[in-house]
Amino acid sequence: SEAASLPVAALTALNAMRKCGVRKGTEVIAGGRTGTRDKTVAEVLVTGGTGGVGHFAIQIGRAYGARVTATCSPANAELALKLGASETIDHNAVDLFSSGRKFDAVFDAHGHMKIWKVHRLLKPGGAYASTLFIPPPYMAIAVTRILHGRKLMSANMRSLDEDWRELERLCSEGSLRPVIENTFPLERASDAFDLAMRGGFRGKIIVTV
């Protein structure tokens, strides 16, 4: 059942980290830059840090050497820290956009961020990835201007051999492990769906066949 929870969510998180320039063995290479390395550790923000995609993103970011800040509820803060976050922020109590915080990369795993405000959270050359729909290229140009030159990218999963091998490596070395909120038999699939629609759960929901 743990393996069943990996494909879409973990691949989405992996793709987001890579598109934002956070890769194995790198420091700050935000926005996909591959030039001279900055010796500073990459600062990454993950929203929805204990959700289905976000909890994978925290672990991948940590495995790649980034300093991950995660948004979550106070009830889930301990879990986020155990997953590898260096810091948690209560998304209901703190207005990130007016906080003055800056990150090399922002991954909106929750999918609720206002795109036109994201530039306030990004350092120059920073990158923003989201699980939401990202505009096509001709519209993305306009959005990039709104972001003041910061990069905007979709975190949609891709299914390539190299990505599957990387997930296998991360799991084998113990750097990536799914959190299972609940497991339902097929005859209770409607209960699983209701839980998913309510939100607020941690990690993944499994339906066994």
Region roles according to the model:
Residues 1-209:
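Terminal helix/beta-alpha structural elements that buttress the NAD(P)+-binding lobe
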